[in-house]
């Protein structure tokens, strides 16, 4: 499963979600604006970087999304 931390109004988050959906990858989407705990969880993965999306796939963390 892939974790995507993002914000609903972020076009890069939307693009990442669409890309994984197109490839039929199981994704858990977490909107960091919904809870301080979600934001803290994202910051833990991203070493404090506040840029979204933060994608966690097979233990690898990617900050941002540039498409495929």
Protein language model regions, located:
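Non-catalytic, surface beta->alpha helical segment in thiol-disulfide oxidoreductase systems
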Residues: 57-68
């Amino acid at each position: 499963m892939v974790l995507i931390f993002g914000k609903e109004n972020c076009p890069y988050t939307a693009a990442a979600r669409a890309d994984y959906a197109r490839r039929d990858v199981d994704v858990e989407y977490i909107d960091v604006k919904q809870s301080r705990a979600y934001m803290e969880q994202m910051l833990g993965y991203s070493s404090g970087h506040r840029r979204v999306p933060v994608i966690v796939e097979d233990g690898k963390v990617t900050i941002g999304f540039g498409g495929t």
